[in-house]
Amino acid sequence: HGDPKFRRDVIGRIYENTKAIEAFDIATEAGLSTTCNFIIGYPYETLENCWKSVELASQLNCSDINAFIYTPYHGTPMRDMCVDAGFISDDLIVEMINNDQGSFLNMPRPYMNKKEIYDMYNNFGKYFRENTVQRDRIGEGKLRQLIA
């Protein structure tokens, strides 16, 4: 995820974006092929949070970048978080993953709705490429001002 605060508070991963960028640069310089997978539609995710993932994706030196819609698997703390927040019912059983189904979560504002999650998933590659071209054209600092 591209938002360090969201990544720390909701996902439980603590690292700065600069470290991720640096790690992918090192791997690429070493001749490794890399894949970066972004998950969209986490519980409590806003569009603003999600756009920070697009921004991060445009800065990563990856061979391949993919996006997937968050799935609330049984037995995970994040699924329990979704049930406790009322984003899904406790009896929901995810038998088969199909991103084209969209999100299982029903989140109120200010969080992403099902349409926003699906649209971001469906267009992530396009947004990432546009962001990369724009960054290269106008410079990274200016892009950060436009996205903020």
Map each language-model feature to its residues.
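A structural motif corresponding to the C-terminal lobe/cap of the Radical SAM core domain
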Residues: H1-L143
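C-terminal non-catalytic accessory extensions
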Residues: R144-A148
